[in-house]
UniProtKB/Swiss-Prot annotation:
InterPro entries: NagB/RpiA_transferase-like (IPR037171), Ribose5P_isomerase_typA_subgr (IPR020672), Ribose5P_isomerase_type_A (IPR004788)
UniProt superkingdom: Bacteria
Phylogenetic classification of the source organism: Bacteria, Pseudomonadati, Pseudomonadota, Betaproteobacteria, Burkholderiales
Protein name: Ribose-5-phosphate isomerase A
Gene giving rise to this polypeptide: rpiA
Pfam family, one: Rib_5-P_isom_A
Pathway assignment: Carbohydrate degradation; pentose phosphate pathway; D-ribose 5-phosphate from D-ribulose 5-phosphate (non-oxidative stage): step 1/1
Keyword tags: Isomerase
GO biological process: D-ribose metabolic process; pentose-phosphate shunt, non-oxidative branch
Amino acid sequence: MLTQQELKQQAADAALALIEPLLGPDVIIGVGTGSTADLFIDGLARYRDRLRGTVASSERSAARLAGHGITVLDLNDVTSMPVYVDGADEIDARLHMIKGGGGAQTREKIVASVADRYICIVDESKLVERLGSFPLPVEVIPMARQAVARALVALGGQPRLREGFTTDNGNIILDVAGLQIDDAPALELTVNNLPGVVTCGLFARPGADVALLATQNGIRRLERP
């Protein structure tokens, strides 16, 4: 039986195979953050001379890319990217996701918004019938912490400050358990509209375009309905 680490590697390798035909001297790839994205970055190193560069969704990923000699570009200097590749903490059959376990969801959303396609790479443990078992990360401007926490309680959540953590943007994370996520796009809009919220970890407006799900029987490919 494959370990979770081996499944993550399988998903990363599948993404590399999927993007290889797209590579070229003018191509820029968007790269996410997390343990599975790290494996994708490690594999991307062998293609570093076949693309113009990358845009990273976190300082962590930027450092890992640079460590492999892969060019990291500022998103402000990039007008288009064919793909953004990232993992997820949870994903459902509609390819809606919860992300932000690493606290990078704001930059992940920004980079993903510029890409033509979002490829999500996950192992089979991340596929769920309904989102919400994984607490929803919400990036919040520090002065709004209590006000946002009260609003999240009113929505049925149980927010907890992620102690000792500051985002790359200088903000805090509230991890919100107990939310009833029946309509992920609607909840994403509601939470993101709370004053003081930078963005939440729901990725449903839109979700991923393709999910490469690593299973004990190989890669299962899911497309957005």
